[in-house]
């Protein structure tokens, strides 16, 4: 795993500078096999950690590579036998039953962003597409020192969040200064209680394997929380982000 949470960013900064100092300085850079670790049995791969990990790294590395390919799409991986568990730490965005893992949602959030970058920080990004504004926020929690140093003994099949440093909720306030305008806001929320199918699996007794009724419940629980609000342009918005949480706000002006 990445010992430093800036590992991907630092590596790409180094690579881009190294390429620029060669006669091939104008070649494209494509990262074809990227994930949080090279271990297809890393139990962290199933946890809520993966959604903000993906969002933060893709946002932070804008402009450093022409593409970054996630490894892989599903947990059905021809280089290894199928895992013994429904959630065995596979690389994929989908598990072997086709359930959406947190990494799937990380890429879904990125897919909703606009093509014009307005503002970017370490915990949120603001974009625009046509007349719509997108605000994507996340509360990233990195590994603790034990796990970051390559010792997996601090976690188990059912206790995986002991791999992470303790961190509290984050509060983000948004203020509009357009009192004459009105907006429709759609909010999508991901955290351990909303959209993290691994956590729902734990909550439902960690069935191995789940039967069809249990799978249907898990499919439902793997979806994001969402709701619509209508706001005046002078309203203030306060968003509470749980650890490992991601929230997307989409604003559309109302004529």
Which role fits each region the language model picked out?
Residues 1-68, 85-87:
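Noncatalytic carbohydrate-binding groove/subsite architecture in carbohydrate-active enzymes
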Residues 14-26, 60-67, 110-116, 175-179, ...:
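A structural motif corresponding to the C-terminal end of an alpha-helix
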Residues 31, 123-144:
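Hard-cation-handling environments
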Residues 35-38, 74-77, 141-142:
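Solvent-exposed loop/turn segments at secondary-structure junctions
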Residues 58, 84-120, 144:
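Catalytic cores of secreted or luminal carbohydrate-active enzymes
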Residues 65-72, 102-104, 115-122, 184:
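Acidic/polar loop patches that form or flank catalytic/metal-binding clefts of enzymes
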Residues 70, 78-82:
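Flexible, surface-exposed loop/gating regions in the mature catalytic domains
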Residues 137-255:
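C-terminal beta-sandwich/jelly-roll accessory domains of carbohydrate-active enzymes
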